[in-house]
């Protein structure tokens, strides 16, 4: 099972401990192209691959504008060392579809039926899909029984509930003259959210971990 785990990295110092435990697949949110997580530049990521000889994947989860796309095109020649890119904006697919770079489709809440999933899996360099974590057990079984390639199943983390390209925390701070922070807890009587912001926008996570680990023994992992 360890060889199937993909760990998103928050701090480069974590990797040594994961590596000692036999984990060799790591996901790095890419600087300038990711939101909601600590990010890393290509030099940092490549140094990890060179040091540990592990599989490295990039997370590109921002909505990109034309300038972003043009800038991304400039780094494509530097991406040959990565094992794959988990992307959200279809522009990434359009820019990389004629390369040898492996892609993993990840449109957040949309990967909930095998028809959509298989459409993307039919593309030449799309090797997998990140399933939505809203799937009920019977829905998950149906998807796994019918997908044409192996997929990625989220098993532990926070659900991203909202993403805005606006810097909402800064807007609030400027409007109400409060001290600005790029991380905040927002809550009312019913629910609590973790807000994170960078120059590219703001995301809200439902501030309670989903945990699928206890259910793994009941899930057929042939397609995972």
Where in this protein do the model-derived segments appear?
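Active-site pocket-lining/capping segments in soluble small-molecule metabolic enzymes
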Residues: 1-119, 130-224
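N-terminal capping/small domains of soluble enzymes
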Residues: 123-124
């Amino acid at each position: 099972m360890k060889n199937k785990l993909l760990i998103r990295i928050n701090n480069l110092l974590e990797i040594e401990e994961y590596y000692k435990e036999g984990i060799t697949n790591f996901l790095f949110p890419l600087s300038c192209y990711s939101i909601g997580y600590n990010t890393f530049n290509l030099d940092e990521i490549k140094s990890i691959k060179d040091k540990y000889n592990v599989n490295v994947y990039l997370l590109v989860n921002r909505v990109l504008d034309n300038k972003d796309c043009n800038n991304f095109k400039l780094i494509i020649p530097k991406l040959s060392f990565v094992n794959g890119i988990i992307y959200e904006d279809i522009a990434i697919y359009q820019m990389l579809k004629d390369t040898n770079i492996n892609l993993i489709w990840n449109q957040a809440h949309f990967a909930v039926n095998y028809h959509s999933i298989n459409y993307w899996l039919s593309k030449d360099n799309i090797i997998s899909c990140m399933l939505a974590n809203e799937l009920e057990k019977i829905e998950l079984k149906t998807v796994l029984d019918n997908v044409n390639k192996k997929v990625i199943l989220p098993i532990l983390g926070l659900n991203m509930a909202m993403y805005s390209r606006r810097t909402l925390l800064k807007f609030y701070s400027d409007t109400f003259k409060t001290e600005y922070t790029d991380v905040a807890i927002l809550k009312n009587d019913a629910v609590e959210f973790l807000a994170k912001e960078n120059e590219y926008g703001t995301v809200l996570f439902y501030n309670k971990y989903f945990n699928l680990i206890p259910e793994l023994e009941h899930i057929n992992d042939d397609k995972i």
